[in-house]
Design a protein with these regions (language model features):
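Bacterial Sec-dependent N-terminal signal peptides
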Residues: 1-25, 192-196
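Short sequence motifs at beta-strands and strand-loop junctions characteristic
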Residues: 21, 45-49, 79-81, 129-135, ...
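Gram-negative (and chloroplast) outer-membrane scaffold detector with strong preference
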Residues: 24, 33-35, 56-122, 129-147, ...
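N-terminal targeting signals for Sec/Tat export/insertion, comprising classic cleavable signal peptides
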Residues: 28-56
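Extracellular loop and loop/strand-boundary signature of outer-membrane beta-barrel proteins
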Residues: 39-43, 73-75, 120-129, 170-178
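Flexible, surface-exposed loop regions and adjacent strand-edge segments
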Residues: 48, 85-86, 118-124, 165-173
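C-terminal beta-signal and adjacent terminal beta-strands/loops
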Residues: 152, 156-163
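Outer-membrane beta-barrel proteins, especially TonB-dependent receptors
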Residues: 161-187
Length: 196
């Protein structure tokens, strides 16, 4: 299956080496893989692998600039799943076959599946949850090869941690924290152009 996927990706890349034209709509299908830096489980693991699949629908205003809106589903190895919805701006720097680009995104991430766990410490029992929800931003840079984009990026996601429990005397307690944490990712996208 991996070989078939790699072969299909290679054929799509090689079969579409032509420059984008202004005045077209673009649908960008993408896949990302990276790591999120946060201690989600209080288990001293600060690095959590994540994968993402998504799409951006936009308009190519010039040979260099496209603007759009998009969403992707992101999941960490700890099964925290979230859906960032964002506005996107992409700028390609020249008109050659290999075109450097930079892309910026800003939006809101909705939690689809949080991470919950139970525990006890020093006579206290507690239930905790970690949600990736709130502010979302990302910046990526790389090169476009025809319709294919390859790059490296960094994203910032709002991590909301909520903990509640009961102390040894049976009294309830609650703790909440909110942090914006970074992640780095490898970016692969294939662009479909239409409307002209």
């Amino acid at each position: 299956m991996r070989k078939l996927t790699l072969l299909l990706g290679l054929l799509l890349t090689l079969g579409s080496l032509h420059a984008q034209e202004k005045g077209q709509f673009v649908l960008q299908a993408e896949a990302n893989a990276g790591v999120l830096f946060h201690d989600l489980l209080k288990d001293n693991r600060k690095v959590h692998p994540e994968v993402a699949l998504g799409a951006v629908f936009g308009y190519q205003f010039s040979d260099h600039l496209s603007l759009g809106v998009g969403a992707n589903v992101r999941q960490t190895s700890d099964v925290v799943t979230w859906l960032p919805v964002f506005a996107s701006a992409k700028y390609r720097f020249n008109d050659s076959k290999v075109r450097p680009f930079v892309e910026a995104r800003c939006g809101y991430a909705f939690c689809l599946l949080g991470l919950g766990y139970k525990g006890s410490s020093k006579g206290n029992s507690y239930v905790s949850s970690a949600l990736c929800e709130g502010f979302y931003a990302a910046v990526a840079g790389g090169c476009s090869f025809g319709r294919t984009d390859l790059g490296l990026g960094v994203q910032f996601i709002n991590i909301h941690t909520h903990e509640m429990g009961w102390n040894i005397a049976g009294e309830p307690f609650q703790y909440e924290s909110q942090d914006i944490k970074p992640a780095v990712f490898l970016h692969y996208a294939y662009n479909f152009y239409f409307g002209k």
